[in-house]
Amino acid sequence: MEKKIIFLCFLVALLTFPEFISSEVIRDSVIHDEEKFANRSYCIKTCATEFTGGDESRIKDVRPRHYKCVCWYYSD
């Protein structure tokens, strides 16, 4: 039983490892003047346009903040 638990932990770590080494995640923000807190879809589109050339699949996460969107995106 103990070997199965260790094997499962190793397997989970192995499956998540490529995400960490595949590309660097960059944190940056975009200022917007339209709303105090923009909605999430607006932030995704704005961050994709600003940092990835419109590629929304490279956006990892966004957080609407006070008159800005905080973006996490993959460098390559």
UniProtKB/Swiss-Prot annotation:
Keywords: Disulfide bond, Secreted, Signal, Toxin. It is found in: Secreted. GO terms for molecular function: toxin activity. Contains 2 disulfide bonds. Expressed by the venom gland. GO terms for cellular component: extracellular region. Residues 1-23 form the signal peptide. The keyword Plastid does not apply. Belongs to the scoloptoxin-15 family. This is U-scoloptoxin(15)-Ssd3b. It comes from Scolopendra dehaani. The lineage of its organism: Eukaryota, Metazoa, Ecdysozoa, Arthropoda, Myriapoda.
